[in-house]
Amino acid sequence: GLGSVPPAEWGEIGAFATRAHELSEDRSAWMKAHERAAILHRAMEIMKERRDHLAFQIANEGGKPLIDARVEADRAINGMDLCIHELGALKGTEIPMGLTSAGDGRLAWTTREPIGPVVAVSAFNHPLNLIVHQVAPAVAVGCPVIVKPASDTPLSCFEFIDILHEAGLPKEWAKAVAPSRDASEKMVTDPRVAFFTFIGSAGVGWSLRSKLSPGTRCALE
């Protein structure tokens, strides 16, 4: 066989969600931007070193031609670079305050902060690049993330999370899981989830969106 991943029950997933919520609520536990950028850069360098291995794994687990798998590996590496550079573009805006006498002489501005725990559910057709698209931005902005890859192609996802940990990301900030259908739905609809990102069929995506807890934002692709 090509490999296997351990099944995850709700107890394990729920414990991670609890810790993710705690991290998000405790500002003193947040990683600094330069720390997150350094982790992503180290992970990108590891991916460059293992590019051929990652490409073979993509090809083997999904049946993709190797020439296309190499393109996917390169796109995933580039996606990491984009996340690092985008960190420098995250900024707030000034709010005009002199439009009323009450605001005259005052300053106000917005800042961007991590939204909170992210749950990602991904698809089979790009088992590494799609995971990078969903997970790396969350790590970049300081959101703990739990990701469920497609059941047919989980190996690249689990390896990417391992690479992030190898690069210095604490394990409590990112986790790959292969849950049952019941545990998957509990994970997605948990009220502690701040953002849900889904890549897959429209029917499944809209169905899951209808079950999200109040306040959970989502992106469907």
Enumerate the predicted regions with their spans:
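Glycine-rich loop-to-alpha-helix module at the N-terminal edge of alpha/beta enzyme cores
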Residues: L2-K91
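Rossmann-like NAD(P) dinucleotide-binding subdomain of oxidoreductase/dehydrogenase enzymes
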Residues: G92-E221
